[in-house]
Amino acid sequence: MLVKEREEKLNRVLVALLGIPVVFSIIRAKIVETIGYFIFWLGGFSPYVYEKITHQEIPERTKLMLSSSVFLHSVMGQFLNFYEKIFFWDKILHFYGSFVITYFFYQILTKKSRFWDEVPGAVLMAFLLGVFSGVLWEIAEFTTDKILPDYNTQKGLDDTMLDLIFDLLGCYTMAKIVYRKKTGRFFWRPRS
């Protein structure tokens, strides 16, 4: 079996597994949890929706990275309670999630789509969009805590700042990887 086919099958399994917490939260009559898990389940389908809208193919490995990030958060972190059971789980996922989203943005910005041609400075733009995604995530956590006071997604300022630091590190690491792949060097130099 080809690598792409294996990645495609694994991705479909992960997206299907994202539905398990939805079913269990419905059975337990936890409406807020059900909505949250359902949103993450839909997130597993979002690369396919994106492809249809933009007429731009996302590499299977990128889709797998995205769905694994959602799976690690939703199923492992929330549903199986790894956020409480495993020290540093939250920080690992902030790093990995930002790493993945930066790679996703790089992939889509370096290919022609229905709406744009290749974006100059795609590495920098992907880095900035990745960091912005991390900031939006923290705003979503803050908003959730204000709307649902018993939910407690943020553990205080230290937690928020460390989350943002790990988001930044994940984005920076991926930006360095794709910059190295694109240019053959790790550091920017002015043109001669």
Swiss-Prot record:
GO terms for cellular component: plasma membrane. Its main location: membrane. It comes from the Bacteria. The keyword Cell membrane applies. The keyword Cell membrane applies. This is Uncharacterized protein TM_0562.1. Keywords: Cell membrane, Membrane, Transmembrane, Transmembrane helix. The chain crosses the membrane at residues 31-51, 119-139. It is a multi-pass membrane protein. It is found in: Cell membrane.
